[in-house]
Amino acid sequence: MAQEKMELDLELPAGASPAEGGGPGGGGLRRSNSAPLIHGLSDSSPVFQAEAPSARRNSTTFPSRHGLLLPASPVRMHSSRLHQIKQEEGMDLINRETVHEREVQTAMQISHSWEESFSLSDNDVEKSASPKRIDFIPVSPAPSPTRGIGKQCFSPSLQSFVSSNGLPPSPIPSPTTRFTTRRSQSPINCIRPSVLGPLKRKCEMETDYQPKRFFQGITNMLSSDVAQLSDPGVCVSSDTLDGNSSSAGSSCNSPAKVSTTTDSPVSPAQAASPFIPVDELSSK
């Protein structure tokens, strides 16, 4: 009944527009105005006809579209978020690996530099600890006037011969050096041996096999010659000395000549006296 009344109310105003101008046909309009929705719909009839179904369709379809789109949006955001997190984690891993590699390289370089420094320090210690026998000896720039240059001394601690530059004299005598320098030396040891020593020994060795008489004659001749040479008052020429030396050598070498000289008559006064005149020497 309500729908029929609505249809009748919609048809009547369009067909009975002149009746509205006349007064008697206005009862139907009043009846239609009694319904609360008809008047509002009649005033907004074009809006109701055009927008009401679309509004209803939108109201009915909008929750469905919203319901379909709502579950899709969190999934897309979640997947993108996961992808972003994975990318960040991958970048973090790459950065961590690069940082770790750099740390390892720096640690290796530091260890290598430490090893080189330790090796250099060990070499320095070995060089300084190597035994040096003469480095610790203080060498004076001015040589000592009492000690000889280049003199060697035996060191009992080093078991070797070292130079005596700045070292005290060793208590053990050196087997290589025969003579040692002394400050106070006796003048007797400095006297040179006699030149007639070898000749005297030779004559003594040869006279061991000769008779006693021959030995006495030779000694008398030698003693007289030495006394004559040592006497500063007698001047003897070089010719006579050469003749005496030759006669003495011939007398020592040949026993016959010696016997002739010893058998010659000599006065006891001349034999006892240590001096022989120059004339007799020249005659001989």
From Swiss-Prot:
Alphabetic keyword roster: Cytoplasm, Isopeptide bond, Nucleus, Phosphoprotein, Protein phosphatase inhibitor, Ubl conjugation
Compositionally biased region (Gly residues): 20-29
Protein location: Nucleus; Cytoplasm
Post-translational modification: CHEK1-mediated phosphorylation at Ser-34 negatively regulates its ability to inhibit serine/threonine-protein phosphatase 2A (PP2A) activity. Phosphorylation leads to its release from the PP2A complex and its sequestration by 14-3-3 proteins in the cytoplasm resulting in its inability to translocate to the nucleus, where it otherwise inhibits PP2A.
Modified residues (Phosphothreonine): T146
Modified residues (Phosphoserine): S32, S34, S42, S45, S59, S73, S140, S144, S184, S186, S264, S267, S273
Composition bias, Low complexity: 175-185, 243-254
Signal sequence residues: none
Glycyl lysine isopeptide (Lys-Gly) (interchain with G-Cter in SUMO1) cross-link, chain position(s): K86
GO BP terms: mitotic G2/M transition checkpoint; positive regulation of cell growth; positive regulation of proteasomal ubiquitin-dependent protein catabolic process
UniProt biased composition (Polar residues): 256-267
Homology family: Belongs to the FAM122 family.
Protein task: Acts as an inhibitor of serine/threonine-protein phosphatase 2A (PP2A) activity. Inhibits PP2A activity by blocking the substrate binding site on PPP2R2A and the active site of PPP2CA. Potentiates ubiquitin-mediated proteasomal degradation of serine/threonine-protein phosphatase 2A catalytic subunit alpha (PPP2CA). Inhibits PP2A-mediated dephosphorylation of WEE1, promoting ubiquitin-mediated proteolysis of WEE1, thereby releasing G2/M checkpoint.
Protein name in UniProt: P2R1A-PPP2R2A-interacting phosphatase regulator 1
Native species: Mus musculus
Origin organism lineage: Eukaryota, Metazoa, Chordata, Craniata, Vertebrata
